[in-house]
Amino acid sequence: MEFIIISVGNEILSGDITNTNAAYMAKKLTRAGHKVKKIITIPDDVNIIAEEVRKASKEADFVLVTGGLGATHDDVTAEGIARAFNRKLVISKEVYEWLSKLSKNEEAVRKISSVPEGSEIVWNDVGAAPAFIVENVAVMPGVPAEMENTFEKILERFEKGEYHEEVVKVNGFEVKIVDKLNQVVRDNPDVEIGSYPKPGYVMVKFSGRDKEKVKKAVKQFEELLNDKR
């Protein structure tokens, strides 16, 4: 399946926090045999959220949105999602009743309980704001522990595909292996090959759905590296 990840938050765009949520989900999805088509970061703006979610829902099989589900003034993601699908924002009775036992702040409880009409609730075991699913979009809290808790439940819904990965470490600079690497890329179109330079060495990752094709590409690359001609 193809996924698009949308991270919502002014604090990400300003550089105040690092977007670890997107990296976490992308890695999990990839290793489950899925493809992440793109990762988008957008501000806490209802209109932008609505526009980007509407577009993403048409481009991908499923969309994962994080951030903006709390009780403060800038938590507007639920409203943006509702607008994206022309749905009313309604109070989830089950969420409202549960939160009312935890807090006497009526305004906060009502805001966190508000979801697009027809949403399915995904309970958050480590925080107040639950996730919800509407059409082909899942919306999760932005706090990493809460995102991980709800994301794992959502990920279980999708059948795992084949995924195989091997990594080769090459000492020296990337420029030394470019020609050989390009040859392997040309010869192995079904294998995704990434080159990641580090101080003093390069990590080359080979991945794909077919284990034998991945191994074949790795073998070819290692043979080319050993060929000193």
From Swiss-Prot:
Pfam families: FLAD1_M, MoCF_biosynth. The lineage of its organism: Archaea, Methanobacteriati, Methanobacteriota, Archaeoglobi, Archaeoglobales. Signal peptide: none annotated. InterPro entries: CinA (IPR050101), CinA_Arc (IPR023055), FLAD1_M (IPR056596), MoaB/Mog-like_dom_sf (IPR036425), MoaB/Mog_dom (IPR001453). SMART domains: MoCF_biosynth. This is Protein AF_2251. Belongs to the CinA family.
